[in-house]
């Protein structure tokens, strides 16, 4: 006899992970494969990062710092903000989920581009909200004017993937700032900068600076890609204290494990 589940999950497609490299080699009789599907770094973490991970193994009988204080302080120093303006999560994906939980209700909407990161539509389904998918501009980037035009009184969250996954098109900080000027200043905007480290534009990094003066803006980043820490799951967000309080209100008490915290902290030193 099946269990009775929430009506909300009926429309959520089950995530089907790709085959592991071992499964692909076994299925096709290969001796090696090059995996590109998940945008993972082909390089392992730095030796210094491996060393702090090894040292941290002795303390696995203890809970991690639930507030990730050392990591928050280091990230706050890097971004020239107060530690209360930094949120730390089990990957930046968790912070995006927390944003949906904290902001969305049935009858509200979340606006995102299409195609973009496949996780965004799930936020609406998981919370009973409605997802508004705005087609990309002809250049493959976010059509920010169209996204602004899609905002109405039901909109609670706008997500901008910058550079966009999967097209790789980057919107400048000036374009993001112009978009912020077009929408209500109390409408939450999350800029997902998972691929920030691969941007060559001269204004790279300035979007996170906007978060110092735009209380409705949260910028998320991850240690998975450039730092090679996919397997440890650690990411962070820079935003107003109001944004961070909202995210902290819905997170688990010990959401970022100890090894992830020390590995991320050491990664910032290199």
Report the location of each language-model feature.
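Short conserved AdoMet
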Residues: 29, 58, 104-105, 152, ...
């Amino acid at each position: 006899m099946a269990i009775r589940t929430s009506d909300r999950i009926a429309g959520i497609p089950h995530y089907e992970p790709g085959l592991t490299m071992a499964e692909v080699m076994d299925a096709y009789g290969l001796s090696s494969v090059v995996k590109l599907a998940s945008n993972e770094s082909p390089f392992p973490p730095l030796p210094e990062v491996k060393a702090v991970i090894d040292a941290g193994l002795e303390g696995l009988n203890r809970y991690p710092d639930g507030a990730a204080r050392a990591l928050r302080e280091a990230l706050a120093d890097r971004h020239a903000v107060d530690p209360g303006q930094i949120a730390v999560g089990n990957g930046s994906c968790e912070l995006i989920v927390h944003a949906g939980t904290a902001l969305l209700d049935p009858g509200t909407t979340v606006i995102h581009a299409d195609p973009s990161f496949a996780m965004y539509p799930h936020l609406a389904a998981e919370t009973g909200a409605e997802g508004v998918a705005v087609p990309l501009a002809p250049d493959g980037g976010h059509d920010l004017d169209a996204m602004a035009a899609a905002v109405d009184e039901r909109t609670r969250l706008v997500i901008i993937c910058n550079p966009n996954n999967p097209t790789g098109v980057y919107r400048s900080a000036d374009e993001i700032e112009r978009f912020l000027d077009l929408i209500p200043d109390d409408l939450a905007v999350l800029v997902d900068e998972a691929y920030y480290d691969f941007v060559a534009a001269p204004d790279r990094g300035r979007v996170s600076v906007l978060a110092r003066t735009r209380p409705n803006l949260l910028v998320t980043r991850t240690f998975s890609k450039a730092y090679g820490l996919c397997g440890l799951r650690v990411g962070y967000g820079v935003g107003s204290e109001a944004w961070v309080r909202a995210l902290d209100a819905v997170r688990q008490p010990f959401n970022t494990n100890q090894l992830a915290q020390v590995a991320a902290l050491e990664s910032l030193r290199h």
